[in-house]
């Protein structure tokens, strides 16, 4: 068994939970009669989970019976 297979024998870890993006502090509202609305936070994208980059999807090995059907007597 190669080192890569040994590494990937275990299933990949679930992707990490994305931290909630922190909005920058909005500027003080200008002295205007209109209500001031701060700009919405830009959406932050989760980085791809590192495990999926390295690890191919783990395929379970089929049981023996599927590969070698028992000989009928």
Curated annotation (Swiss-Prot):
Residues 1-11 have a biased composition (Low complexity). GO terms for cellular component: cornified envelope; cytosol. It comes from the Eukaryota. Sequence repeats lie at residues 21-29, 30-38, 39-47. Pfam families: SPRR2. The keyword ATP-binding does not apply. It comes from Homo sapiens. Induction: During squamous differentiation of epidermal keratinocytes. Residues 21-47 are annotated as: 3 X 9 AA approximate tandem repeats. It is found in: Cytoplasm. This is Small proline-rich protein 2G. Cross-linked envelope protein of keratinocytes. It is a keratinocyte protein that first appears in the cell cytosol, but ultimately becomes cross-linked to membrane proteins by transglutaminase. All that results in the formation of an insoluble envelope beneath the plasma membrane. GO terms for biological process: epidermis development; keratinization; keratinocyte differentiation.
């Amino acid at each position: 068994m190669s080192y890569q297979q040994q590494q990937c024998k275990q299933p990949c870890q679930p992707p990490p939970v994305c931290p909630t993006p922190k909005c920058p502090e909005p500027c003080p509202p200008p002295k205007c009669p209109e209500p001031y609305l701060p700009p919405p936070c830009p959406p932050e994208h989760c980085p791809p989970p590192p495990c999926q980059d390295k690890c191919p999807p783990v395929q379970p090995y089929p049981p023996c019976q599927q590969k070698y059907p028992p000989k009928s007597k």
